[in-house]
């Protein structure tokens, strides 16, 4: 990676954190006015996602000399975020224009499309090959982690959902989200166990952190929705 690309990535990282901090500060300032906070959240969400989409498609364009797999990976992640943006736009229209509860709704179709596309994008990222012994060790460790997390998800999230008094569609979609988060978690673990070229470390660290944040916020949202506290 040349100096120009390093500076560009550094500036992009600074900009991303500046936007995140600004969003958090404004949300805190609007905490006393639930309606304004809702409007702010519904409007800024798609705007931020459009910036992310532009960045991912630019990454695909800039990596055209690094192989087709790299380009496909960035394109898939860009398409994944495009579906998220469509979901947020649909959510905003339902909530602000029609004053209806957007969950469950058609917005969930777009949100759910994000998970397999994003996980597939991670899969297409080029990585160095492991030795046979390392590969078996990694498979065993990943299996243990996924089994443990799967049991925890069943005990604390999936099983309570199945006995919840909420409508069937709400429970069904909530369980699908949990399962897809599990798919995303698998992609994250695979990302952590992969050996990438040094030039990919920075962007992939940000992607990994974003995946962790998404999984955590998803679970908080599901719990609040099912408990009626959202």
Q: In which residue ranges do the predicted regions lie?
A:
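Polytopic alpha-helical membrane-helix bundles and their juxtamembrane interface segments
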Residues: 1-230
């Amino acid at each position: 990676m040349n100096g120009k690309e390093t500076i560009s990535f550094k500036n992009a990282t600074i900009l991303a954190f500046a936007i995140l901090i600004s969003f958090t500060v404004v949300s805190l300032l609007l905490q006393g006015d639930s309606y304004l906070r809702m409007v702010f959240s519904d409007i800024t969400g798609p705007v931020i996602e459009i910036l992310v989409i532009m960045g991912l498609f630019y990454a695909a364009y800039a990596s055209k000399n690094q192989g087709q797999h790299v380009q496909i990976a960035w394109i898939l992640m860009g398409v994944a975020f495009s579906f998220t943006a469509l979901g947020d736009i649909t959510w905003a229209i339902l909530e602000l224009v029609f004053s209806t509860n957007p969950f469950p709704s058609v917005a969930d179709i777009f949100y759910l499309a994000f998970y397999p596309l994003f996980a597939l994008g991670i899969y297409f990222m080029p990585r160095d090959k492991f030795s046979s012994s390392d590969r078996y060790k990694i498979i065993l460790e990943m299996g243990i982690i996924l089994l443990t997390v799967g049991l925890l998800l069943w005990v604390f999230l999936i099983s309570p959902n199945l006995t919840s008094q909420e409508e069937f569609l709400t429970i069904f979609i909530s369980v699908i989200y949990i399962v897809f988060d599990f798919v995303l978690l698998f992609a994250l673990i695979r990302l952590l166990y992969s050996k990438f070229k040094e030039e990919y470390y920075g962007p992939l660290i940000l992607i990994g952190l974003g995946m962790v944040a998404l999984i955590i916020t998803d679970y908080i949202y599901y719990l609040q929705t099912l408990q009626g506290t959202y």
